[in-house]
Amino acid sequence: MAPKAADKKPASKAPATASKAPEKKDAGKKTAPSGDKKKRTKARKETYSSYIYKVLKQVHPDTGISNRAMSILNSFVNDIFERVATEASKLAAYNKKSTISSREIQTSVRLILPGELAKHAVSEGTKAVTKYSSSTK
């Protein structure tokens, strides 16, 4: 039996991945170890798509983004995070510390990002940490 037109959801402009929060990767496991044939759970991908989409709508409410562009931006964010984490890890090792603090993150951002971009990133990061600290008290 065909679904009625009233039962359908209206189409949205947001990409399918943008409506979901970053998802955790689940190793595909069977739900029952016995002989029952159960479907494996689908491995979930963690992405920054929903956050990128929210920022895009704050800056340009009438602009959309293609899945390919979203994938490129997601790769960019992952790459920058990996570079910052690697540099912060090296800084902690140089100083014979086993913990990465906000100071190592800040220094690694200054080393990785050029000039004015580093200054803005550090100020935004400081603002975010201050906001978080005040909200948890």
Curated annotation (Swiss-Prot):
InterPro entries: Histone-fold, Histone_H2A/H2B/H3, Histone_H2B, HISTONE_H2B_site. It comes from the Eukaryota. There is a cross-link at K131 (Glycyl lysine isopeptide (Lys-Gly) (interchain with G-Cter in ubiquitin)). GO terms for cellular component: nucleosome; nucleus. The modification N6-acetyllysine is found at K8, K9, K13, K24. Keywords: Acetylation, Chromosome, DNA-binding, Isopeptide bond, Nucleosome core, Nucleus, Phosphoprotein, Ubl conjugation. One of its GO terms (molecular function) is protein heterodimerization activity. Monoubiquitinated by the UBC2-BRE1 complex to form H2BK123ub1. H2BK123ub1 gives a specific tag for epigenetic transcriptional activation and is also prerequisite for H3K4me and H3K79me formation. H2BK123ub1 also modulates the formation of double-strand breaks during meiosis and is a prerequisite for DNA-damage checkpoint activation. The keyword Cell membrane does not apply. Its main location: nucleus. The modification Phosphoserine is found at S12. Belongs to the histone H2B family. Core component of nucleosome. Nucleosomes wrap and compact DNA into chromatin, limiting DNA accessibility to the cellular machineries which require DNA as a template. Histones thereby play a central role in transcription regulation, DNA repair, DNA replication and chromosomal stability. DNA accessibility is regulated via a complex set of post-translational modifications of histones, also called histone code, and nucleosome remodeling. This is Histone H2B. It comes from Chaetomium globosum (strain ATCC 6205 / CBS 148.51 / DSM 1962 / NBRC 6347 / NRRL 1970).
